[in-house]
């Protein structure tokens, strides 16, 4: 059931927290999916067109869930989304009363369904058949086996799937939770995605309005914006949801979402509401277990981050064929088509989001600034503040004024090495399908760290002091200014040259300890007003993502215009790893700094 009336209330009271997105917006994202909810939707959606019964094999076993799960998973991957399916464990004891009520409703629906079949009322048959559906343990096990054979990760929650999904987002192992149960927000999921399985199959009799010409539309709810829009902290939000009505306890009769919100705003907690409420007007249940319900939301039974294993395995093609064709009598041609789509879809997930490709231009390190200051003292420029044509040109002029110091010879060699590196990248781009640039890129489904290919190689460029690209600043004050805005550092909060990063109070440090695949997202950090960030401050903002293979955008012919649009939105200069040839500077904006 989730939280009664929560989505509608949020839409009215905190409209900025809800927005419509297209499935394409989730490209490159890892999404934790409530598997039981998905299977339920597939069984309802994929039915016999005449009697609205489940699809079955020759033995009479239901196959709707298998067909829907396979088709939908491939479709998600074809759009670049990386799904993790989370299955329910044992239901919590507090939910016993709610489960009994659901059982009674299902029994009543079965009686009405039987009557509708006797009367031949197809509309009533369709209505009641959906209410009698339940996902069995056997169907869950079949779904797990199918996903494993497809190479898609499965997580078995010790209790509720939506709470485990929420904690996957808290652990930064997933971007969002996909479920229709709004209580995922109460468990603390950062982002909730609804309608992910809308129009689950082309065989469904009802085309969802969201699958219109304008695209496959999803609903995204952002928890941070919910709290901001309602002006509640998380504890107040949890108590508000309990008062609205949840699965874990009864609620106070006569209190709906609007009244609950007003009471929470006035008294801040359920305890104080009970103390001050008009007992004649509102009847409090004799067994109002709100304290236990609150604890279930705050401290749910979930796997810890260390206990979770996300296994992006290779598809087991032959076993998958046998499972579908021999065990469940799927058409061989149809299965072959699914497998071909699956293999192609895995390649789509290697394409990174455009905002992953661009990273804000790295600010100069203290070490580099000091070196430049020393140069300025030794060599006075002809015109103070004169704009240099390019870093290489300026460094060449400086070296000529220093009477060919030994350092200049070393720098020339470094520049040559950099040129070779780019040539090597170009050769990789010209290679066959599936080849990647030499930057430590891995199979997107491989999450293990490559010790032989440190994450720092992702950028594959040397600091200005190492490469000879020493750039003069117009004034001494500018050269020694504390960097503000977005500062991107290498491991341990250091910059490209190995010096510590010094931040202003308005700075945000992105400490990239591991830039291989999704771990880059997991280990990115926002550290505001601190020059000594600690691991664990994992607050990921929109667009603060990285790619382990910047050449993907080049290999896939990134649209120049679209790239410039994204850059204009950020209104900053960028550092482009491997400097793609088909992306140029944005006019009337700060120029793109080449590698």
From Swiss-Prot:
GO terms for molecular function: 5'-3' exonuclease activity; 5'-flap endonuclease activity; DNA binding; magnesium ion binding. Phosphorylated. Phosphorylation upon DNA damage induces relocalization to the nuclear plasma. Interacts with PCNA. Three molecules of FEN1 bind to one PCNA trimer with each molecule binding to one PCNA monomer. PCNA stimulates the nuclease activity without altering cleavage specificity. It is an enzyme of class 3 (hydrolase). Residues 426-436 have a biased composition (Acidic residues). DNA binds at residues 47, 72, 160, 245, 247. Binds 2 magnesium ions per subunit. They probably participate in the reaction catalyzed by the enzyme. May bind an additional third magnesium ion after substrate binding. Belongs to the XPG/RAD2 endonuclease family. FEN1 subfamily. It comes from Plasmodium knowlesi (strain H). Its EC number is 3.1.-.-. This is Flap endonuclease 1. The keyword ATP-binding does not apply. It holds the Pfam family XPG_N. Residues 392-401 have a biased composition (Polar residues). The keyword Cell cycle does not apply. It is found in: Nucleus, Nucleolus; Nucleus, Nucleoplasm; Mitochondrion.
């Amino acid at each position: 059931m989730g939280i009664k009336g929560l989505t509608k209330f949020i839409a009215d009271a905190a409209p900025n927290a809800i927005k419509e997105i297209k499935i394409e917006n989730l490209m490159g994202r890892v999404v934790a999916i409530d598997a039981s909810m998905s299977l339920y939707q597939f069984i309802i959606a994929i039915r016999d067109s005449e009697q609205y019964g489940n699809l079955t094999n020759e033995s009479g076993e239901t196959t709707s869930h298998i067909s829907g799960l396979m088709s939908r998973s491939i479709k998600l991957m074809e759009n670049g989304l990386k799904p993790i399916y989370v299955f329910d464990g044992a239901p919590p004891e507090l939910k016993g009363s709610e489960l009994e009520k659901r059982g009674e409703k299902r029994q009543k629906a079965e009686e009405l369904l039987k009557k509708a079949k006797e009367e031949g009322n197809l509309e009533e048959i369709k209505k009641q058949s959906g209410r009698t559906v339940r996902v069995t343990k056997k169907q869950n096990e079949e779904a797990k086996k199918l996903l494993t054979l497809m190479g898609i990760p499965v997580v078995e929650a010790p209790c509720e799937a939506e709470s485990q999904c929420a904690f996957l987002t808290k652990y930064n192992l997933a971007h969002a939770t996909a479920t229709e149960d709004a209580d995922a927000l109460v468990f603390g999921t950062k982002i909730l995605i609804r309608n992910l399985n809308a129009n689950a199959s082309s065989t469904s009799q009802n085309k969802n309005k969201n699958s219109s010409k304008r695209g496959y539309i999803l609903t995204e709810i952002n928890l941070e914006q919910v709290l901001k829009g309602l002006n509640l902290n998380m504890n107040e939000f949890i108590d508000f949801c309990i008062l609205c009505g949840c699965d874990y306890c009864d609620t106070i009769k006569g209190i709906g979402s609007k009244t609950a919100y007003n009471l929470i705003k006035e008294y801040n907690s359920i305890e104080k509401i009970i103390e001050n409420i008009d007992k004649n007007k509102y009847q409090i249940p004799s067994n109002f277990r709100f304290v236990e319900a609150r604890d279930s939301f705050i401290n749910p039974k979930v796997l810890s981050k260390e206990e979770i294993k996300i296994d992006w395995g290779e598809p087991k093609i032959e076993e998958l064929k046998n499972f579908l064709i021999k065990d469940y009598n799927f058409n061989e041609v149809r299965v072959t088509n699914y497998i071909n789509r699956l293999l192609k879809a895995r390649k789509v997930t290697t394409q990174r989001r455009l905002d992953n490709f661009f990273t804000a231009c790295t600010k100069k390190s203290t070490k580099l600034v000091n070196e430049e200051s020393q140069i300025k003292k030794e060599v006075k420029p002809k015109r103070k503040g004169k704009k240099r044509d390019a870093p290489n040109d300026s460094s060449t002029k400086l070296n000529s004024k220093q009477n060919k110091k030994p350092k200049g010879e070393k720098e020339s060699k470094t520049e040559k090495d950099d040129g070779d590196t780019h040539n090597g990248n170009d050769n990789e781009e010209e290679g066959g399908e599936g080849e990647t640039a030499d930057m430590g890129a891995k199979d997107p489904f491989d999450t293990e760290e490559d010790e032989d290919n440190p994450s720092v190689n992702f950028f594959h460029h040397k600091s200005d002091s190492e490469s000879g690209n020493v750039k003069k600043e117009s004034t001494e004050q500018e050269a020694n200014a504390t960097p503000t805005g977005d500062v991107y550092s290498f491991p341990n909060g250091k910059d490209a040259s190995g010096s510590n990063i010094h931040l202003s109070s308005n700075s945000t440090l992105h400490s990239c300890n591991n830039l291989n695949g999704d771990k880059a997202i997991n280990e990115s950090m926002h550290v505001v007003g601190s020059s000594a960030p600690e691991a664990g401050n994992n607050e990921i903002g929109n667009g603060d993502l990285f790619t382990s293979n910047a050449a993907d955008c080049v290999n896939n012919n990134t649209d120049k215009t679209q790239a410039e649009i994204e850059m204009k939105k950020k209104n900053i200069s960028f550092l482009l790893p491997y400097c793609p040839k088909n992306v140029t500077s944005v006019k009337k904006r700060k120029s793109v700094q080449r590698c």
